[in-house]
Amino acid sequence: MPDYAFLKTDLINTTENDSTEFATQIPFFITKAEFRLTKDLDDVGLDEYTNVSVSSGNAGAVPLNDRVRIVRNVNFKVSTGTTVTNLLQRTVEYANDYWPVSASTGTPRYYSRRTNSSIKIVPTPVSATTVEIQTASQPLALASATGTSVTTSNYFSEYCYNALFYSCLIEATLYMKDWETLQVWRSEYQNAIQTLRNQARRTRQDDMEVAASPAGGPNTITQAGS
């Protein structure tokens, strides 16, 4: 699988620029490219699941890690083995109106994005409750050495290499002020992104399965023209 070293060599060979100054800039090219990919892709490969203990002490501001970009889903179980309950997403204003007294407790029903680094859950749970948060997150940063926040390979390098490579070339070409070639890499990047978006759509298609109610029983869902 392609890793940081592979990508670095590929960039140097493609640009035919083996200068020390260029090599020093490569980590910055990669960082900017990864940020671009996270914004341009809607891919299940970016999804992460995190379990967080929620209680009266933090229900008003449940922390999210700094790589979270989108909160997709929040659910919980009252105790082990019980049915999973999905919380409904609402605005902060709605949550505050619905449950104005945070000291009061009840069964969690709603969540809202409070800031870029936290969500609010209401009602405040009666006791500590484990909540599973599904998020679209920035993968750990690709770098030459491993650590708590970096890795030599990640989802982009392993499954989206062409898009990552062309995105890096856009940054490299901007750095070298090669305006004519810049349009070539931008075009190649868009082609790679469209391919990945099509792949993402294919993961969500139902392959012509008959629409049915998730609750089971008689089918209450009808399709247009049926």
Predicted features, each with a name:
Residues 1-226:
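Glycine-enriched, solvent-exposed interface loops adjoining structured elements
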